[in-house]
Regions:
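Helix-biased detector of long, well-ordered alpha-helical tracts
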Residues: 1-218
Length: 218
């Protein structure tokens, strides 16, 4: 016993619905390894999960992390968890637990992976889905702060093909490790003011493919 995490459900929501999301940061981890910089990758992890909650109108409640690693490195883990804590503070959700697995038979020296799991809550009438989107609605884009945590396999391929060393390029070094923006405050502010009918993360496929995912068939 004692391995489960318990949290309160807010009482001010009439018809509460739980929304769950899990994600990782993909091969951005390889950039962190190359630069030996691990204090922001945890922010990325939280962002990838909570940004998937808010597009359905849900307020993030809790977050859990999973870290699998070749060999436990306390300094590296402290930096990763520091980022996770910061991400949770930005998104106003509670870090309620996590798991660290030492797996030398799976990961080679210095290699690791991280995954996150988050649960949010939304009143049923405030859920953002296709049914609320209608003709003459405006499409508004919120600028990102960089490339977030998507497309890093392509980024790394381009770097390798062109023999670019990011350690020697200050601009690339800063841009490629920059943590994913957490959009919780902006989106939930729009939800609470009833100014938004639908929301979508613009990732692989760009504006065209992603916006189409939330448009009703009619």
């Amino acid at each position: 016993g004692g391995f489960g995490s318990i949290t309160n459900i807010p009482k001010n929501i009439k018809n509460p619905q739980l929304v769950a999301s899990t994600d990782g940061v993909g091969t951005k981890i390889e950039i962190a390894n190359e630069l030996n910089k691990f204090d922001t990758i945890g922010i990325d992890l939280v962002a990838m999960c909570v940004n998937d909650l808010i597009v359905q109108g849900a307020k993030p409640l809790i977050f859990l992390d999973y870290i699998s690693i070749n060999k436990v490195d306390s300094n590296k883990l402290k930096k990763i968890i520091k980022g996770i804590i910061k991400g949770c503070k930005i998104s106003n959700c509670e870090l309620v637990g996590g798991e660290t697995a030492e797996m030398p038979g799976t990961y080679s020296k210095d290699k690791f992976d991280i995954a996150g799991f988050s649960v949010g809550i939304v009143d049923k009438k405030k859920i953002l889905d296709k049914s609320k989107i209608k003709v003459n609605d405006l499409i508004v884009g919120i600028p990102s702060n960089g490339i977030h945590s998507n497309g890093y396999s392509l980024v790394r391929y381009i770097l390798k093909k062109n023999k670019i060393k990011i350690k020697k390029n200050k601009f690339l070094k800063n841009e490629l490790i920059k943590p994913t923006k957490i959009y919780v405050k902006e989106i939930l502010n729009l939800v609470n003011k009833k100014l938004i009918n639908g929301c979508v993360n613009i990732t692989g496929g760009g504006l065209r493919d992603n916006i189409n995912r939330i448009l009703p068939k009619n």
